[in-house]
Amino acid sequence: MCIRDRHDISPKRIKPEDFFAVVEISKGSKTKYELDKETGILRLDRVLYTSTHYPANYGFIPRTYAADKDPLYVLVLCSEPIQPMALIQCYPIGMITMMDNGYADDKIIAIPFEDPTYNSYHDISEIPRHVFEEMSHFFSVYKSLERKETAIDEIQDRAAAVKVIEEAIETYIELYCR
C-alpha cells in the first residue's frame, strides 16, 4: 500500500480513541525517516548523531494537523519493531508535550490493540517506569550533537491525548475537507 500523504486513508479509520498510525521509524532504529509528500515514499531525513535509538515505533496519525503544521506524531509502544510504512491500529494512553528548537511538539503515546504484551495498559501512569524514562531520555538528548535543543515539558494522561487528537482531526477537516 502506498500512502502518498496523510490524506490517503478513510476518515472512518481515524478516531481519537481508535486510530491507524503509519509507522515511519522502527523501534530500535537510529535512522530518521519522513514520508516524502511528493512521492509517498519514505526518505532518509538523517541518521541520528547521538548513540541513542528510537525507544518505540514512531510515526504519524493520518488525517490530523498539529500545531507544528505536520500530522500528529505518535510513539507506538509495542513488544516488536514494526516495519516502516505499516499501518497499526492503536489507542492513546497519554502524550509527551515538549519543545523542539523553541517550538511546541506533541507526541501521542499509543498502544496497538493486537499486542498482548502492552494492550492491558490504558493510561500512561500504568506503564513501567523504565519505559517512560527511556522515552523521556531519548527526546531530551536525541538532537544534542546536532546543537539543537529539545526539552520535555510534561507528560499528560489519556484524556489529554484524546483531546489533542480530536483537535488535530478537527483542524485537518477545517483545512482540507471544507
Task: Tell where the protein language model's regions lie, with residue ranges.
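C-terminal, well-folded lobe of enzymatic/effector domains
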Residues: 115-178
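Short, structured beta-strand-loop surface elements
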Residues: 71-126
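Extended, highly charged
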Residues: 7-13
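Conserved small/polar residues in nucleotide/adenosyl-binding loops
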Residues: 1-5
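Betabetaalpha-Me/HNH-type nuclease active-site subdomain
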Residues: 15-59, 63-72, 77, 84-87
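Solvent-exposed, non-transmembrane amphipathic alpha-helical segments
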Residues: 43, 62-64, 85, 94, ...
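Short, surface-exposed, polar/charged, turn-prone segments marking secondary-structure boundaries
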Residues: 49-52, 63, 87-88, 102-105, ...
